[in-house]
Amino acid sequence: MPRTENDTWDLASSVGATATMVAAARAVATRAEDPVIDDPYAEPLVRAVGIDFFAKLASGELTPEDLDVSGDESPVGMSRFADGMAARTRFFDDFFTDACAAGVRQAVILASGLDARGYRLTWPEGMTLFEIDQPEVIEFKRTTLAGLGATPSTHLATVAIDLREDWPTALRDAGFDPSVPTAWIAEGLLGYLPPDAQDRLLDTIGELSASGSRLAVESVPSQQSADQDEMREKMKDSTDRWRSHGFDLDFSELVFLGERANVPDYLRERGWAVTATPTNDLLTRYGLAPLDTDEGFAEVVYVNAAR
């Protein structure tokens, strides 16, 4: 079923399943011969969600090669998807590392999903990390990691609220201080927001960001009306092969396509100093093979902004 602005989900359904998919890709990337990232919590979190397809992928019982069919013309195979998620994860990891090195001691992860940075990264003394996501997601991750004996590696403050609600008030109530510099990330989020909601989110972040704040996001390409059907067909092709392994969810129905603001330009116009890195530059930076121009997320740009 296509997305609506007030729809609901959990980690096993609709857009929530994308968090599980990305965590499975992080587990695959962690097992690589020369890994770009190390996320020891990805596999157990995916297993706990209970989607058999992703659990098998995360554990290695099902390999990306099992899904990458020779001659398949879908936009990106699972092996390349895992590479892309490894590079994406490392980009946001490095963003936090650099922000902390610059003296930032307050960070926010928007729509945190199965992100375990509050457990797996090394944070400086005096750091506070806020995670925002739906209450069920926050509680699931907390209880699952506690069951593994994992403890946060910094002061972790969870904010259990949907981003479509009054999350700035909830964030302040959790101890967020808008008068001090903040490092924000919105990883894998903007494409799942309607274009006007993307703008509102970026505006709100700006309103809450003191001088010295930083922001890292992905900028997904704007889709002209004539291109949307073609893009949806490409996305359907990417997931058709998964159905033979028992996972039936059409990811083409989960995103909001259409024309939207160019994120680097939008932020520059609002006083941010912006560096925009194309996906292939990021892959090359981390020693991974670049994508062809017609592969699934080759046009995504990674944005690092400061004010």
UniProtKB/Swiss-Prot annotation:
The keyword Methyltransferase applies. GO terms for molecular function: methyltransferase activity. This is Putative S-adenosyl-L-methionine-dependent methyltransferase Mflv_5023. One of its GO terms (biological process) is methylation. InterPro entries: Ppm1/Ppm2/Tcmp, SAM-dependent_MTases_sf, SAM_mthyl_Trfase_ML2640-like. S-adenosyl-L-methionine binds at D133, D162, L163. It comes from Mycolicibacterium gilvum (strain PYR-GCK) (Mycobacterium gilvum (strain PYR-GCK)). Exhibits S-adenosyl-L-methionine-dependent methyltransferase activity. Keywords: Methyltransferase, S-adenosyl-L-methionine, Transferase. Residues 213-234 are annotated as: Disordered. The keyword Zinc does not apply.
